[in-house]
């Protein structure tokens, strides 16, 4: 059977299957939603170029729990703090499955810590959390690595001599080096080909997956597998990244000492040796490669993207930048780098960083979840295996939780006495059982990097502050800041 005949047969089978699926639409206890069409689902009611905005608008028509069909796939969408919190935290076990994300799944095959499920996911997460803690995650030892890397970054920024530059690659190299030191055992020089390759693959994939191409692939993966486009580059990048990691793993195998692990890879290899005779073990080479990739991706792109958002925001609001610098000067001075111990004495700076994360909303739709059993929820019944999208943008912009959600306002995280206050609706790392395991590292990096930069430099835009556009470039996987250059002038 040739390719065309196969495609026609698959299309006919899909039509039959979808006709049966949509015949039962609206029956039972599913949440309400727009009526779907066979094959297309609700795509005519959604903008493929901006799925986030379309889903957010539908929540105003159908409420905080509604059903949509992304092509043939039925998805429950949750919006608003109370609803999302009830699902991810109060019913965390029921909503702990990982939903369909074809552009990732076609590479990971459900392997690795981010996209695995069930017992495999629980075992991998428990192991990874323990190993990351052993190598200093959230502790003084990892702080020392961040301070060291921060000093290298400051040296690079000084060499810009106050001239305009694009911060993307400079930030990515520095941020990526921290998670690389945990995974591979040492940092890379900034011109090391391996580091540059890692950053290229990660940055390129994050941009494509945040674009309409990435969104459409997740809706019609079988169709787009036959269509040329930038989505094909994602898989080439994935393959290149896997090869790079595999080379490093082979080098580790040649010098492995199980009694003296140097890094995450050593610990995983040792676990593989220990469970070699167990045919049901989840610790194998493919899992190691996928988990390492997940950690590199998560540990590089989101922090770098958040820092770029912070630069734009601080240039648009120079009074906020000046007040942060004033607090840094008062608490830290100029003779040493800021440390985590300083954070408790810097409530305004802490509030600004949290507000940047809320306002930038870097991962606005979260990664998809899935209910692992039939789940009663807010008067409806969500069938086992149903994918769930939690709109984190509607949490971070919930007017019941934040006084002026559409505005950048550090007062959202300050009490009447100007002391820092937490908000339960702060979920940039998601929440519940699928909470990002890199949260402690990311929070440390954001504080030390931003305060160190503002201690030494003032950020200057190339346009007037009022002309800076904070509207994100993409709203798929990630909210990316629009490309920009800036000048950093030594204070």
Curated annotation (Swiss-Prot):
Please indicate if the UniProt record lists Oxidoreductase as a keyword. Answer: yes
Q: Which cofactor does it need?
A: heme
Return the protein name: Cytochrome P450 2F2
Q: Which UniProt keywords apply?
A: Endoplasmic reticulum, Heme, Iron, Membrane, Metal-binding, Microsome, Monooxygenase, Oxidoreductase
What lineage does UniProt assign to this protein's organism?
Eukaryota, Metazoa, Chordata, Craniata, Vertebrata
Matches recorded under InterPro entries: Cyt_P450, Cyt_P450_CS, Cyt_P450_CYP2_fam, Cyt_P450_E_grp-I, Cyt_P450_sf, Cytochrome_P450_fam2
Stored SUPFAM superfamilies: Cytochrome P450
Homology family: Belongs to the cytochrome P450 family.
**Chain residues that bind heme:** 436
Give membrane topology per the record.
Peripheral membrane protein
**Disulfide partners:** none
EC number(s) from the headed UniProt entry: 1.14.14.-
The subcellular location is:
Endoplasmic reticulum membrane; Microsome membrane
**Function statement:** Involved in the regio- and stereoselective transformation of naphthalene to trans-1R-hydroxy-2R-glutathionyl-1,2-dihydronaphthalene in the presence of glutathione and glutathione S-transferases. It specifically catalyzes the production of a very reactive and potentially toxic intermediate, the 2R,2S arene oxide, that is associated with necrosis of the unciliated bronchiolar epithelial cells or club cells in lung.
Q: Which Pfam families match?
A: p450 (PF00067)
Q: What are the BP-aspect GO terms?
A: epoxygenase P450 pathway; naphthalene catabolic process; response to toxic substance; trichloroethylene metabolic process; xenobiotic metabolic process
The enzyme class is: oxidoreductase
Establish whether keyword Membrane is in the entry.
yes
């Amino acid at each position: 059977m040739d390719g065309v005949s196969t495609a026609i047969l698959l299309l006919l089978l899909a039509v039959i299957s979808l006709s049966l699926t949509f015949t039962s639409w609206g029956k039972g206890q599913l949440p309400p939603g727009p009526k779907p069409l066979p094959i297309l689902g609700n795509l005519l009611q959604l903008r493929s170029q901006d799925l986030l905005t379309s889903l957010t608008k539908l929540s105003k028509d159908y409420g905080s729990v509604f059903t949509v069909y992304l092509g043939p796939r039925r998805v429950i969408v949750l919006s608003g703090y109370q609803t999302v919190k009830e699902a991810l935290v109060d019913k965390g076990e029921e909503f702990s499955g990982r939903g369909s994300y074809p552009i990732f799944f076609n590479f990971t095959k459900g392997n690795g810590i981010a996209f695995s499920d069930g017992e495999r996911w629980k075992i991998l997460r428990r192991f990874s959390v323990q190993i990351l803690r052993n190598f200093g995650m959230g502790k003084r030892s990892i702080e020392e690595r961040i301070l060291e890397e921060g000093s290298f970054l400051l040296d690079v920024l000084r060499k810009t001599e106050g001239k305009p530059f694009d911060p993307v690659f400079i930030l990515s190299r520095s941020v990526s080096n921290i998670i690389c030191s945990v995974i591979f055992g040492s940092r890379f020089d900034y011109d090391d080909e391996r580091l540059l390759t890692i950053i290229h693959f990660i940055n390129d994939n994050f941009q494509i997956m945040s674009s309409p191409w990435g969104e459409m692939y997740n809706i019609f993966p079988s169709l787009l597998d036959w269509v040329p486009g930038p989505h094909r580059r994602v898989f080439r990048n994935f393959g290149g990244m896997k090869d790079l990691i595999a080379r490093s793993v082979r080098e580790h195998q040649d010098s492995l000492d199980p009694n003296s692990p140097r890094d995450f890879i050593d610990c995983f290899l040792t676990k593989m040796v220990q469970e070699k005779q167990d045919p049901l073990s989840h610790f194998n080479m493919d899992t190691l490669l996928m988990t390492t990739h997940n950690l590199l991706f998560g540990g590089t792109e989101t922090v770098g993207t958040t820092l770029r958002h912070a630069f734009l925001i601080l240039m648009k609001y120079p009074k906020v930048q000046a007040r942060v610098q004033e607090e840094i000067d008062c608490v830290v001075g100029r003779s040493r780098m800021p440390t985590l111990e300083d954070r408790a004495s810097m409530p305004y700076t802490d509030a600004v960083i949290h507000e940047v994360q809320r306002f930038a909303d870097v991962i606005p739709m979260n990664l998809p979840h899935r209910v692992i059993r039939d789940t009663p929820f807010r008067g409806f019944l969500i069938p086992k295996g149903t994918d769930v999208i939690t709109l984190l943008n509607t949490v971070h912009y919930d007017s019941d939780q934040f006084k002026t959600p559409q505005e950048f306002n550090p007062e959202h995280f300050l009490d009447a006495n100007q002391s820092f206050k937490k908000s339960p609706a702060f979920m940039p790392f998601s929440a519940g059982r699928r909470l990002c395991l890199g949260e402690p590292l990311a929070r440390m990096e954001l504080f030390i990097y931003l305060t160190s930069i503002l201690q030494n430099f003032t950020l200057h835009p190339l346009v007037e502050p009022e002309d800076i556009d904070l509207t994100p470039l993409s709203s798929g996987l990630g909210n990316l800041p629009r490309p920009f250059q800036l000048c950093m002038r030594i204070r």
